[in-house]
């Protein structure tokens, strides 16, 4: 196998480390930050050289799709990943209209989904109304598509104004209560609510 330059070795070692610790490869931006390269095109150039030299394989149709293919592959604990669609944004504060289109695909370790992959999507959280449930501004919530919920479930709901929000769900006698997990905020009371899905997991980039 052809020899690597110092910079290529740094990038290759970083990719291996992230795959070992997280189970999936880093993004181009993360690689650049790790090795001190501000230009994404420069990072892409080094990745192309690594690919030409037979150290990695890439799928240009998917983000983060970097596969280690050197003779050291057996040393790397690679967890199976799935590419989950990121569907717009949903607020965890004052509701905003959800953008019902796929913005990107995000790789997740398969064990985080624990259900049929086609039923899973991700929403980016904006706001602080769920902080006491450990859901912070900027987190990605992993959501299973479903139209029913039980009391106490954390759900993605569409309100009567066709706004999307993440809240804890309660069905009361004559209404629904969408309860924030922030003691400084008031619940939302609704006559009708559409359950879009149940939050089954959380991803946070450290």
Swiss-Prot record:
Gene Ontology molecular function: DNA binding; serine-type endopeptidase activity
Keywords: Autocatalytic cleavage, DNA damage, DNA repair, DNA replication, DNA-binding, Hydrolase, Repressor, SOS response, Transcription, Transcription regulation
Catalytic machinery residues: 129 (for autocatalytic cleavage activity), 167 (for autocatalytic cleavage activity)
Catalysed reactions listed for this entry: Hydrolysis of Ala-|-Gly bond in repressor LexA
Residue ranges for the DNA-binding region feature of this UniProt entry: 28-48
Keyword Hydrolase among UniProt keywords: yes
The protein's Enzyme Commission number: 3.4.21.88
Purpose: Represses a number of genes involved in the response to DNA damage (SOS response), including recA and lexA. In the presence of single-stranded DNA, RecA interacts with LexA causing an autocatalytic cleavage which disrupts the DNA-binding part of LexA, leading to derepression of the SOS regulon and eventually DNA repair.
Membership in a protein family: Belongs to the peptidase S24 family.
Name under which the protein is recorded: LexA repressor
